[in-house]
UniProtKB/Swiss-Prot annotation:
<dbReference type="InterPro" id="IPR023794">
    <property type="entry name" value="MI/DCI_dehydrogenase"/>
</dbReference>
<dbReference type="GO" id="GO:0019310">
    <property type="term" value="P:inositol catabolic process"/>
</dbReference>
<dbReference type="GO" id="GO:0000166">
    <property type="term" value="F:nucleotide binding"/>
</dbReference>
<dbReference type="GO" id="GO:0050112">
    <property type="term" value="F:inositol 2-dehydrogenase (NAD+) activity"/>
</dbReference>
<comment type="similarity">
    <text>Belongs to the Gfo/Idh/MocA family.</text>
</comment>
<dbReference type="Pfam" id="PF02894">
    <property type="entry name" value="GFO_IDH_MocA_C"/>
</dbReference>
<keyword id="KW-0560">Oxidoreductase</keyword>
<dbReference type="Pfam" id="PF01408">
    <property type="entry name" value="GFO_IDH_MocA"/>
</dbReference>
<keyword id="KW-0520">NAD</keyword>
<comment type="function">
    <text>Involved in the oxidation of myo-inositol (MI) to 2-keto-myo-inositol (2KMI or 2-inosose).</text>
</comment>
<comment type="subunit">
    <text>Homotetramer.</text>
</comment>
<protein>
    <recommendedName>
        <fullName>Inositol 2-dehydrogenase</fullName>
        <ecNumber>1.1.1.18</ecNumber>
    </recommendedName>
</protein>
<dbReference type="InterPro" id="IPR000683">
    <property type="entry name" value="Gfo/Idh/MocA-like_OxRdtase_N"/>
</dbReference>
<dbReference type="InterPro" id="IPR004104">
    <property type="entry name" value="Gfo/Idh/MocA-like_OxRdtase_C"/>
</dbReference>
<dbReference type="InterPro" id="IPR050424">
    <property type="entry name" value="Gfo-Idh-MocA_inositol_DH"/>
</dbReference>
<dbReference type="InterPro" id="IPR036291">
    <property type="entry name" value="NAD(P)-bd_dom_sf"/>
</dbReference>
Amino acid sequence: MTLRLGVIGTGAIGQEHIRRCSKVLQGAQVVAVSDINVEGAKAALARIGIDAQVFTDGYQVVKSPDVDALLVTSWDPTHEEFTLAAIAAGKPVFCEKPLAMSAEGCRRIVDAEIKFGQRLVQVGFMRPYDSGYRALKNVITQGEIGEPLMLHCAHRNPTVPESYTTDMAITNTLIHELDVLRWLTEDEYKSVQVVFPRSTSKTHGRLRDPQVVLFETRKGIRIDVEIFVNCAYGYDIQCEVVGENGIARLPEPSAVQMRKDARLSTAILTDWKDRFIAAYDVELQAFINDASAGKLNGPSAWDGYAASVAADACLKAQNSGGVEPIELPQRPAFYR
C-alpha cells in the first residue's frame, strides 16, 4: 500500500521533504501540495520531477479524499491550525517544529488528540533518529557509564542572519536540545538559568551571542548547553554525558582524516542539513511506515508541548537572569 501524502507549505524544508518522500524513501507518494505562492509550488514540483495537485489553501489538502496523511511545513504560526485540522479529519500528520507558537497552543493540540482517541501527530524532532544520538542513548540505557550525573552540550552555527534575535537562540536553536536531552536522559527538566558570557564581535545589536543555558532535571542531573550561533568555524553539535563510572560522547560525523602540509586535519561541516540528512530520512521513513500501519511511535504532541513549556521558561530566564522553574504537568496516560 502506498501512503498518499499532502504537503502544506513548499518552502525550503517542504521541498526537501517532497524530494525525500518522492525520490529517496519507500511507501509514499506526494499527491497534493499547498502554498500561498502557487507558481512557486508548481516550479518546485517541476524541479523535483513529480506531478501533484496544487492548492492555495492548506485546508483543501487536509480535506482532500486523495490524501491519507499530511506533512505540515508551512509558516510557523500556521502549524497549530493545520495540525488541529488534520486531527479533526482523522489523518496522521507530521508537523515540523514548532508544533505551535506557545505552550498553550501545543496543549490545545494535545487535548484535541486525546479527545480523538488515537495518536495522529508526530513532531519534526529529528535528533532521536540520528545514529550518533542512538548509539549514545544505547550506552546510557545499557548502564555502561552508570547513572548520568552531568551533560555538557554545545550547539554552534557558523553564522546567522541579522533577523535572528536573542530569543530565537531558544525557540529555533535550543529547541532541538530541549527535546533530545529529555529523550536521552529519560528525565524531565526542573529548572533553568540562562547566562550571557562576553559577546562575540560577530554578533549584532538584537542578538546576545553566545549564551549558556543551565538546567537541573527532576533526578538532579545538571546540564549545560552552550549556544553559539556565530562561531565562524562551522556547524558543530556536541554532547558529553558524565556518568558514575565513565564518560560517553556523541560521535563526530564521519569525515576523511588528512595528513598534508605538515598538518593532521579533519573537515567540519558547515550546514545543518548535511549534518542530519540521514536522520531526516530515517525520521520520515518511520512516519510513513507508522502512518501506514495506523500507529505512530515518533516524537509526540506531548513531546512538542514539553519542549515548548521548557522553552517558555528559558525565555523567562533570559530576561530575569535568575533560576526559573519548569513546571510540566504529569504526562497523560495516553502518551505513556
